[in-house]
């Protein structure tokens, strides 16, 4: 029974599972630094962070187990083809580094909060955070560049061309979707992550000036590269919307993915430009210098700040647009019904499926972007509206993450128990003996997939 349950669970692994870490993790970050702070919210953030860590460890272990079993049953080449060349799976590897970044950001916040209380522990934690950040950056680059190359290299003819006259037309009709952004958004996320700690006091005590400068430069290069790449893909997706129209009901929540680079990009550029100003103020003092040097020392950092503010507001403006379009698209399916072929159940747009998770992280990034704009510039110009918007986006993100988490736990517990029972009965029948494998076409396993199918989003 236990073996059947484990094998059934192993078969359900998909890189998309790390989306749960993203949603719960960013919720913990939002609660920790909520626009209207409260002690009980800080306590809730610790709980959400613990849940995010547990999910990350569990999914990581499941991924390793899935890899071992898959290679044992088939081969590494088939694993590579299925999970790195097949666009139903490879795009979702981007959720892994983004989920890890939410954990890194929370650990960085804890390190900064304990700078005076426990300097030694805070310093050691910051070093650990910095090492994790470099690991995450490496993973982001491998995924963004590697998966993009595999997609561009050739078509992966898993299902053939179907009713299309060529692979080109099939690609244009089926795969020009917002999920293409999932492999590039991690670059935006990891670039903004280093901005949260690079110029902090504890980072200054743990590392020298050269490390800070190198980190700032790499952060800037990563952010610029990612934003350009993102807008190229968004332009392609706009073309798809004009040609193929909005996604079908089961995929409509993927529209929210467009909010991710907008909110996180604004958050990142605000932190980056503010860190440049802090760096100049710290290492280029205005004492004993000429008037021209003093003007440059003051003007150059503020030029970056102004560019950061304008860029952030432009990205947030697009984020508001995508928010409205996404909500209206969902509402347009309110009266539509679909019947599942496998179970015959009637599905509505509000029937829970894994696509619901696609709304959590993007809403959280919009909260971070709005709140950071308020924090940095409210001292010069009243910007309370952005604080309110950050609260609204953050509240939706946290509540939606909790809803998705509870519904996911319910679906998994129900379907896994069902799959294990059916597999056990099937293998013990007197007429047919079958070795229960994660890759055998057993009826019970197929039935369990109906509500847990991640590939419908790709």
Swiss-Prot record:
One of its GO terms (molecular function) is sulfite transmembrane transporter activity. PANTHER family: PTHR31686, SULFITE EFFLUX PUMP SSU1. One of its GO terms (biological process) is sulfite transmembrane transport. This is Sulfite efflux pump SSU1. Changing residue 122 to S: In strain: Bb32, M1-2A, M2-8, MMR2-5, MMW1-15h2, MMW1-2h2 and Sgu52F. It is a multi-pass membrane protein. Keywords: Cell membrane, Membrane, Phosphoprotein, Transmembrane, Transmembrane helix, Transport. InterPro entries: SLAC1/Mae1/Ssu1/TehA, Sulfite_efflux_TDT, Voltage-dep_anion_channel_sf. It comes from Saccharomyces cerevisiae (strain ATCC 204508 / S288c). Residues 1-11, 70-89, 157-176, 242-252, 331-350, 409-458 are cytoplasmic.
């Amino acid at each position: 029974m236990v073996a059947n349950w484990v094998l059934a669970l192993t078969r359900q692994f998909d890189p998309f599972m790390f989306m749960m870490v993203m949603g719960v993790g960013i919720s913990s970050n939002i609660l920790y630094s909520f626009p209207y702070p409260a002690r009980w919210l800080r306590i809730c953030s610790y709980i959400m962070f613990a849940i995010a860590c547990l999910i990350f460890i569990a999914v990581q272990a499941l991924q390793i187990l899935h890899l071992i079993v898959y290679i044992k049953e088939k081969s590494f080449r088939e694993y590579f083809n299925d999970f790195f060349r097949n666009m139903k799976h490879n795009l979702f590897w981007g959720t892994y580094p983004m989920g890890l970044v939410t954990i890194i950001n929370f650990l960085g916040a804890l390190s900064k909060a304990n700078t005076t209380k426990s300097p030694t522990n805070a310093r050691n934690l910051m070093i650990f955070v910095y090492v994790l950040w470099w690991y995450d950056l490496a993973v982001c680059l491998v995924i963004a560049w590697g998966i993009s190359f595999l997609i561009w290299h050739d078509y992966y003819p898993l299902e053939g061309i179907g009713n299309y006259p060529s692979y080109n037309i099939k690609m244009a009709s089926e795969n020009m979707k917002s999920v293409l952004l999932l492999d590039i958004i991690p670059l935006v996320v990891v670039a903004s992550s280093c901005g949260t700690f690079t110029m902090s006091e504890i980072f200054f005590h743990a590392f020298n000036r050269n490390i800070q400068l190198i980190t700032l430069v790499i952060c800037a290069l990563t952010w610029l590269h990612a934003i350009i790449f993102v807008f190229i893909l968004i332009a392609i997706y706009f073309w798809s919307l004009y040609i193929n129209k909005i996604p079908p009901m089961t995929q409509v929540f993927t529209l929210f993915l467009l909010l991710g680079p907008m909110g996180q990009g604004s958050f990142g550029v605000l932190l980056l430009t503010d860190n440049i100003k802090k760096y100049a103020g710290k290492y280029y003092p205005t004492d004993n210098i000429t008037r021209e040097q003093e003007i440059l020392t003051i003007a150059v950092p503020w030029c970056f700040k102004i560019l950061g503010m304008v860029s952030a507001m432009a990205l947030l403006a697009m984020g508001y647009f995508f928010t409205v379009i996404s909500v209206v698209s969902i509402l347009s399916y309110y009266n539509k019904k679909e019947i599942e072929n496998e179970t015959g159940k009637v599905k509505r747009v509000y029937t829970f499926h894994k696509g619901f998770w696609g709304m959590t992280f993007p809403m959280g990034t919009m909260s971070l972007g709005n709140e950071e704009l308020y924090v940095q510039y409210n001292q010069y110009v009243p910007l309370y509206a952005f604080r309110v918007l950050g609260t609204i986006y953050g509240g939706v993100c946290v509540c939606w993450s909790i809803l998705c988490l509870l519904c996911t736990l319910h679906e998994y517990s129900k379907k896994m128990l069902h799959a294990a029972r059916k597999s056990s009965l099937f293998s013990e029948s007197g007429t047919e003996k079958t070795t229960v494998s994660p890759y055998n076409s057993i009826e019970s396993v197929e039935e369990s997939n109906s509500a847990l199918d991640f590939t419908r989003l790709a």
